Regions:
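C-terminal catalytic core of tyrosine-transesterase DNA break-rejoin enzymes
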Residues: 159, 207, 211-218, 299, ...
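Basic, Lys/Arg- and aromatic-enriched nucleic-acid-binding interface segment
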Residues: 136-140, 144-146, 159-165, 169-223, ...
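C-terminal secondary-structure termini that scaffold catalytic or DNA-interacting sites
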Residues: 1-3, 194, 231, 244-270, ...
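N-terminal DNA-binding recognition helix of tyrosine site-specific recombinases/integrases
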Residues: 7, 11, 98-102, 109-122, ...
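Active-site/catalytic core of tyrosine-dependent DNA strand-transfer enzymes
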Residues: 28, 186-187, 239-242, 265-314
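N-terminal DNA-binding module of tyrosine recombinases/phage integrases
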Residues: 15-122, 275-284
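Short functional hotspots where side chains directly engage DNA or cofactors
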Residues: 169-170, 231-236, 317, 328, ...
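Catalytic-site neighborhood detector that most strongly recognizes the C-terminal catalytic loop/helix
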Residues: 42, 175, 183, 240-242, ...
Length: 381
């Protein structure tokens, strides 16, 4: 049997066309045969420089035969074997969409071991300028999400000896741009509350949202078993998702901290208690036509848009109702740690970072109070 050649071992030769060619061992097949990486150059000196860089790059590499598969083939495997079993269906659908529309059309046919950081960087620039196969430039946030998917997939490729290094480690990501939040001020919030009074079907839904700041899926997924009228609490145990192609599925809360018990304001306890007396469904907010099913998250979003327009209020995302609740809670004196628990944030620091526009105002107000106190103290002294 031929001796197994170690990785990094190589050879140099001059080809018939006059160019110099070199190769190094970068792995082995199942039968023990070597897997080579080839480089070529016009001169022997140039070749040796290239070869030296390759030896450094592939130092300690032990690639398998699968290193010859394309990036597209690997993405299919990673999505099926790694992503699908470990993430929520909605997240998995998003991953598949990014792969099919933004990665595979441009880099999918390239051998995975030959995908470079330059290839990935070019892809990201193209997506920002022109978009994927659907057309339309993609936002920095979307490109960063696509990067997250590709980065995860290629990390596993490194672990499985398909590539030596993750090429996405060496790319520059578009600058993160935080989307502007639309917060209803006191007068606007009053108008919104007046608007929902005219909608018997949706009033309770939006009242609960404004007084708890629940995520849309959490709100739609509430059941009567989650409500304790005596204690005045609401337990958030699940979240509802729209299923692609129609229907819904019930999943876990977004994070571990998302599973929480919220102390409700007395007015909200009274509202839910009265609602429960006439309810015929296990869901707090059932589908009006099929009460055995919950109301769909998209329905709440659509109705909110109409209510805002009818009330002459600024257009906003459903999530901005959550921001509105949080902003008014902070300005009313609720401390950040308590608010973090109500919102289901994993860390209080995230709450503080998210609502810096509020905490900044609170700090300025506090400094003014301290300043007045110190001025009085100095004068009295």
């Amino acid at each position: 049997m031929a001796k197994r050649r170690p990785s990094g071992d190589g050879m140099v030769r001059k080809r018939d066309d006059g160019r110099w060619e070199g190769r190094i061992v970068v792995g082995h097949k199942e039968n023990g045969d070597s897997i080579f990486h080839y480089v070529s150059a016009k001169t022997q000196k140039a070749l040796m420089e290239k070869l030296h860089r390759c030896i450094v790059e592939y130092d300690g590499a032990e690639l398998t035969e699968d290193c010859r598969m394309t990036l597209g083939e690997w993405l299919d495997i990673w999505l099926r074997e790694c992503a699908e079993p470990s993430v929520r269906p909605s997240t998995y659908a998003g991953y598949c969409g990014y792969a099919e529309r933004s990665i595979k059309p441009f880099l999918g046919s390239k051998q995975i071991s030959k995908v470079t950081a330059a290839d990935v960087q070019t892809l990201y620039r193209k997506l920002q300028r022109e978009g994927g196969v659907d057309g339309g430039a993609l936002s920095p946030a979307t490109v960063r999400r696509i990067h997250g998917v590709l980065h995860q997939a290629l990390n596993v490729a490194v672990d499985r000896h398909l590539i030596v290094k993750n090429p996405t480690d060496d790319v520059t990501l578009p600058k993160k741009v935080t989307a502007a939040k639309t917060i209803l001020n006191d007068k606007q919030l009053e108008r919104f509350m007046e608007a929902i009074k005219t909608d018997e079907h949706w009033h309770d839904f939006f009242y609960l949202e404004i007084t708890t700041g629940l995520r849309r899926g959490e709100l739609c997924g509430l059941m009567w078993t989650d409500f304790d009228a005596e204690k005045g609490t609401l337990t958030v145990r699940r979240t509802l998702h729209n299923k692609e192609g129609g229907g819904y599925y019930v999943g876990e809360t977004k994070t571990g901290a998302g599973r929480r018990i919220i102390k409700l304001p007395p007015s909200t306890v009274q509202l839910l208690s009265e609602r429960k007396r006439t309810s015929i469904s296990q869901w707090i907010f059932p589908n009006p036509i099929h009460p055995e099913d919950p109301i769909m998250p998209n329905s709440g979003y659509t109705r909110m848009k109409k209510l805002l327009a009818e009330a002459g209020l600024p257009d906003m995302r459903f999530h901005d109702l959550r921001h509105t609740f949080a902003t008014h809670a902070l300005t009313s004196g609720v401390d950040a740690k308590t608010l973090s628990g109500i919102l289901g944030h994993t860390k209080t620091s995230f709450t503080l970072d998210t609502y810096t526009h509020v905490t900044g105002d609170m700090h300025r107000k506090a400094s003014g109070i301290v300043g007045e106190f110190m001025s009085d103290f100095v004068v009295k002294g």
